Amino acid sequence: MAKTRLYLVRHGKTMFNTIGRAQGWSDTPLTAEGERGIRELGIGLRESGLPFIKAFSSDSGRTIQTMGIILEELGLTSQIPYRYDKRIREWCFGSFDGAYGGELFHGVIPRVLKTDNYKELSWPDLANGLVEVDTAGWAEPWDKLSGRILEGFEAIAREVESSGGGNALVVSHSMTIGTLAHLVDENITKNPNVDNGSVTVLEYENG
């Protein structure tokens, strides 16, 4: 059986990314710059010669758009199985979804949680802090958030493994990929910088 590898791609740069708004469950399309970056990624993956047997993304428009571009550049549109999984969506920022990120991450969160830098917070503290400041009641507490992210990626990995293993493309989101990295390796305690169009490779084995 081939090794099971997930190639985790953060979606391309969007309108909200460009103007600095918090983009969780809210959604905006890729900009022209974002599309170009993902096309370059697709070309790079094609030139690498890596074979991909399945594709997955969250159900957000920006990840679906990103995957469409990558598959087009790989010549795999409609050629390999592709499905959405809402469990690998971005974090929900509740009443701050769509607000300016600076207001949330450099203003409200540091003030409420009494820290100078939100990136120094642990993942659980940041998640539970969002719940505390969310007036809409939509943000997910850490246990629920981490549970659905781990469940989603494990289901994807098991699906690939049960097909005999191989490489799968997975398009997701910055904080979701960072959360998964922490859940896989607890030494990754802080928010890593996951750039638009970056690739993180995760190897899965033994169920």
Indicate residue ranges for each PLM-predicted region:
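Active-site catalytic pocket residues across diverse enzymes, especially alpha/beta-hydrolases
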Residues: 70-74, 160, 184-188
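Extended, basic/helix-rich recognition subdomains
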Residues: 145, 153-154, 165-187
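Active-site-proximal alpha-helix that buttresses catalytic centers in soluble enzyme cores
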Residues: 2-78
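Short glycine-rich phosphate-binding loop at a beta-alpha junction
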Residues: 51-59, 81-83, 164-171
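Domain-level recognition of soluble alpha/beta enzyme cores
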Residues: 185-207
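Phosphate-handling substructures
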Residues: 73-148
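Active-site glycine-centered loops adjacent to acidic/histidine catalytic or metal-binding residues
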Residues: 11, 87, 173
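Generic structural signal for well-ordered alpha-helical scaffold segments
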Residues: 39-46, 71, 146, 150-161
